[in-house]
Amino acid sequence: MKQSEFRRWLEAQGVEVSNGTNHLKLRYQGKRSIMPRHPSQEIKEPLRKAIIKQLGL
């Protein structure tokens, strides 16, 4: 899954996404996580699972 697709999926789940310097800040119901900002690259499965776990989705 590309990072841009994952970002759209997160936004559909209600995650608030804001831009950091070299990354995206993710917020969901008081929980926070970060994601690198490389929209055309594939996001590795362990990172995707970690973000989902950190946000409690």
From Swiss-Prot:
Its Enzyme Commission number? 3.1.-.-
Instruction: Kindly name one Pfam family recorded for this protein.
Output: HicA_toxin
Instruction: Please name the SUPFAM superfamilies in this protein's record.
Output: YcfA/nrd intein domain (SSF54786)
Under the heading InterPro entries, the entry gives: HicA_mRNA_interferase, HicA_sf
The answer to keyword ATP-binding applying to this record is: no
Source domain of life is Bacteria
Q: Which UniProt keywords apply?
A: Endonuclease, Hydrolase, Nuclease, RNA-binding, Stress response, Toxin-antitoxin system
In the UniProt record, does the keyword RNA-binding occur?
yes
A Gene Ontology molecular function term of the record: endonuclease activity
Q: Which family does it belong to?
A: Belongs to the HicA mRNA interferase family.
The role this protein plays is:
Toxic component of a type II toxin-antitoxin (TA) system. A probable translation-independent mRNA interferase.
Q: How does it assemble?
A: Probably forms a complex with the cognate antitoxin HicB 1 which inhibits the mRNA interferase activity.
Q: What is this protein called?
A: Probable mRNA interferase HicA 1
